[in-house]
């Protein structure tokens, strides 16, 4: 290709030279004196234009070929990303053919409940619920494997959609993507910096992870509606280490304090004391780490991520007690900002309201809204979902219908929760089982 262009270029040069000589000769003989000379000049110009046109065509072909040569490289990079996202995962059951999944961290109760550890009646009650505990453990093992994958694969420059799909497809793969029997417990949250919770990318999202971002990775796994709710914070710059250390310590404090008959306010008070004992220095300015007082942990019901009880991360005088057999998500949020969040930004998280009155459902008149509700019931039930999950089911032009379901009270929306812009927030969370004889931090792993 290069040699052909060079030959044409030489021809163009030759024609130019010939044309120049011809013009010079004509000028020496006087203008328009010889029609013969004028014809020669016109012929040379025609040759020049043809040669130039040919050269331009060959240059265009050369450029097109270069682009074609580059395409495989671009496609190869895109393919690598797609393969990473669409990687096949063997169902977790293939690794545990006997159906028994590993326990989490088992902790004896203390003080007045110490007797539970050896009490035969309590041990018998625990055995009766072994199938339930085992389903939580299955979800926890999936969570541990997926978050290890996430920590290994997530890098600055990845889009939020790439990260979310990497995590969610891995959960679906390990779960066997079994609809309401197993899979995502709620959408993958990837809240950045001053955004503390409830951000997951929608289909049109162009946001990209940067080196200096602080990202809360919060995702759930469920097995027959038994939900593992666990979260960690991912950073690349070690200047945030003290912030992460504060929140991790606060979460572990909440886990230690939790137990049967423990008052919720006492847990919040212990968490607050630990969190506020930390400081973090960022770009020469020192901040006390503040608990985000209007965020909290919660108990978990079957197919219900929020079961009705809230575990505060500050003292709040709620004397409600934890009870035997309950499951709790112990989570804490620390901030360099004001320690208070508000709902702001484009919503991605939704869930059918399990307490919606019957007349709210019967009041839905628009057929499209009824159809969408049927899709939600069949695929998510009362588990939280996001707009990308609806897209994935092939639904189109559903936003008006979704908003109608929200306005009717049948579906609840959960917009992103943000602290003051410019601040940084971190989160750590574990799921604990208050078994009759021991407390099990079922989602505990070697990482946190």
Curated annotation (Swiss-Prot):
Cofactor: Co(2+); Zn(2+); Mn(2+); Fe(2+)
Binding site residues for a divalent metal cation 1: 218, 229, 429
Catalysed reactions, as listed in the record: Release of N-terminal amino acids, preferentially methionine, from peptides and arylamides
Entry keywords, A to Z: Aminopeptidase, Cytoplasm, Hydrolase, Metal-binding, Protease
Record field: compositional bias (Basic residues): 24-34
InterPro entries linked to this entry: Creatinase/aminopeptidase-like, Met_Aminopeptidase_Type2, Pept_M24, Pept_M24_MAP, Pept_M24A_MAP2, Pept_M24A_MAP2_BS, WH-like_DNA-bd_sf, WH_DNA-bd_sf
GO molecular function: initiator methionyl aminopeptidase activity; metal ion binding; metalloaminopeptidase activity
Segments for region (Disordered): 1-47
Domain of life: Eukaryota
Family (UniProt): Belongs to the peptidase M24A family. Methionine aminopeptidase eukaryotic type 2 subfamily.
NCBIfam families documented for this protein: met_pdase_II
Protein name: Methionine aminopeptidase 2
Taxonomic lineage from the root: Eukaryota, Fungi, Dikarya, Ascomycota, Saccharomycotina
Gene from which the chain derives: MAP2
């Amino acid at each position: 290709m290069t040699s052909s262009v060079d030959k044409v270029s030489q021809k163009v040069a030759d024609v130019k030279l010939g044309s120049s000589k011809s013009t010079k000769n004509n000028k020496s003989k006087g203008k328009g004196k010889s029609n013969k000379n004028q014809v020669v000049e016109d012929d040379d110009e025609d040759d020049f234009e043809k040669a130039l046109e040919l050269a331009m065509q060959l240059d265009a072909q050369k450029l097109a070929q270069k682009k074609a040569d580059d395409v495989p490289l671009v496609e190869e990079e895109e393919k690598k990303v797609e393969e990473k996202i669409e990687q096949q995962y063997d169902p977790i059951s293939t690794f545990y053919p006997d159906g028994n999944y590993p326990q989490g961290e088992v902790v004896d109760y203390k003080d007045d409940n110490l007797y539970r550890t050896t009490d035969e009646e309590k041990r018998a009650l625990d055995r009766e619920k072994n199938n339930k505990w085992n389903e939580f453990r299955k979800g926890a093992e999936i969570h541990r494997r997926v978050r290890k994958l996430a920590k290994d694969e997530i890098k600055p420059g990845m889009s939020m959609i790439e990260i979310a799909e990497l995590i969610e497809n891995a959960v679906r793969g390990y779960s066997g993507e079994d609809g309401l029997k197993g899979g995502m417990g709620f959408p993958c949250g990837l809240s950045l910096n001053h955004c503390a919770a409830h951000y997951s990318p929608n289909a049109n999202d162009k946001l990209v992870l940067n080196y200096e971002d602080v990202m809360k990775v919060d995702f759930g796994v469920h097995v027959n509606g038994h939900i593992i709710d666990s979260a960690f914070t991912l950073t690349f710059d070690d200047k945030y280490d003290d912030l992460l250390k504060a929140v991790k310590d606060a979460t572990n404090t909440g886990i230690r304090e939790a137990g049967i008959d423990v008052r919720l306010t006492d847990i919040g008070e212990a968490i607050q004391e630990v969190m506020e004992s930390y400081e973090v220095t960022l770009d020469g300015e020192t901040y006390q780490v503040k608990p985000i007082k209007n965020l909290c942990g919660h108990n978990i019901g079957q197919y219900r991520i929020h079961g009705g009880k809230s575990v505060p991360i500050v003292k709040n005088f709620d004397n409600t007690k934890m009870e035997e057999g309950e499951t709790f998500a112990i989570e804490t949020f620390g901030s360099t900002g004001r320690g208070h969040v508000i709902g702001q930004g484009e919503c991605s998280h939704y869930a059918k309201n399990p307490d919606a009155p019957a007349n709210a459902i019967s009041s839905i008149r628009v057929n499209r809204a009824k159809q969408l509700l049927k899709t939600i019931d069949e695929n998510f039930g009362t588990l939280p979902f996001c707009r990308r999950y609806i897209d994935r089911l092939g639904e189109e032009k559903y936003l008006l219908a979704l908003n109608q379901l929200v306005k009717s009270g049948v579906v609840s929306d959960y917009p992103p929760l943000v602290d003051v812009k410019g601040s940084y927030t971190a989160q750590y969370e574990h799921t604990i089982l208050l078994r009759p004889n021991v407390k099990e931090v079922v989602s505990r792993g070697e990482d946190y």
